[in-house]
């Protein structure tokens, strides 16, 4: 089998940022989707996110994105990476990291400032509704904004090659 694109990124060089992971086209319709790698922690160097805060960011992020005035109709998916170092954001259209950056900043401001009941955190709405950690989700979002997104540069918007 061929190695998939995400495994060809050198995770020893990868740092937190906003990267285009892949751009896919439906061969039948020509529809395009862009997958973004929203990397919150440095792989294999910083601790990964625990499932509870990851789950909370997923609930808040999906709710925010699917209700966004400009982007809601273009959102395909938002959810955690299996390695728990970040999230995937999938949108309709061919979109660059620079173009998605304002939305990513808005999204993580929403998560960082969120107070109250986490949307979808009820037994009839979620299969693991008790696995939530809002204070840690707030903290991770604020750190991503302040440390990684505030003065983001080219090296953190495009994958670097060895």
Where does each model-flagged region fall?
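Active-site-adjacent, His/Asp/Glu-enriched structural segments that form or flank metal-binding
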Residues: 78-150
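M16/MPP (pitrilysin/insulinase) zinc-metallopeptidase core fold and M16-derived inactive scaffolds
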Residues: 43, 47-99
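Arginine residue identity/basic-tract feature
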Residues: 3, 22-25, 39, 66, ...
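Histidine-acidic residue clusters that define the catalytic metal-binding segment
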Residues: 147-162
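Generic preference for flexible, low-structure residues
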Residues: 20, 52-54, 70, 94, ...
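His/Glu-rich zincin catalytic helix
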Residues: 1-53, 57-65
């Amino acid at each position: 089998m061929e190695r998939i694109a995400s495994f060809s990124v050198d995770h020893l060089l990868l740092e937190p940022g906003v990267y285009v992971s892949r751009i896919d086209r439906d061969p039948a319709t020509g529809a395009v989707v862009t997958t973004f790698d929203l990397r919150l922690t440095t792989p294999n160097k910083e601790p990964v996110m625990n499932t509870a805060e990851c789950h909370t960011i997923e609930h808040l992020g999906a709710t925010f994105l699917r209700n966004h005035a400009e982007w809601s109709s273009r959102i395909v998916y938002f959810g955690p990476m299996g390695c728990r170092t970040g999230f995937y954001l999938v949108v309709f259209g061919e979109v660059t990291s620079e173009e998605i950056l304002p939305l990513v900043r808005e999204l993580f401001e929403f998560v960082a400032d969120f107070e109250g009941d986490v949307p979808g955190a009820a037994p009839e709405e979620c299969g693991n509704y008790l696995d939530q950690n809002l204070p840690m989700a707030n903290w991770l979002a604020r750190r991503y904004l302040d440390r990684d997104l505030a003065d983001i540069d080219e090296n953190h918007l495009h994958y670097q090659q060895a």
